[in-house]
Amino acid sequence: GIFYVPILDATKFNTTSGMESLFLHEAIPGHHYQVSLQQENSQLPKFRRFGGNSAYAEGWALYTESLGKELGLYTDPYQYMGALGDEMHRAIRLVVDAGMHSKNMTREEAIKFMMDNEPLSEEGTIAEIERYMAIPAQALSYKIGALKIKEIRERLTKQLGAKFKLSDFHDE
């Protein structure tokens, strides 16, 4: 398939960092690849082939971003710096999502926290915060899912020792 990145204003969008982590997350080995394999797997029941699970889907996509460094896929330091910026964004999401839904953080406090801690536009920040308001814990699902995949990988690495193959783990 083809992966398109719709850039509304190329004069304002930073393509010098973060594009490779975006590709890993959204395309290969991220969502595009994951969903293609999932939908082609006739051994899965239909609710798993065509349904969604945010912790699995977003967890996998976030996990694949970490593979960029591990497998030497980032082509320059700016792309890796962009990946680290994306990781910071995920950490900030954890604070505001959990804060709004369990700690009485207001919409305005969440917007301020996000704008104080990362370089997003006000419009982008408001859109993010309203997304978290509408879909509680969706932002949390990225990190929780990725951590669970890493936990399973570490457990299997210890259990299997020299027999552990990363490609086999990713195939399961």
Regions found by a protein language model. Give the residues of each.
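Long, His/Glu/Asp-enriched segments that create or flank divalent metal/ion-associated functional microenvironments
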Residues: G1-E172
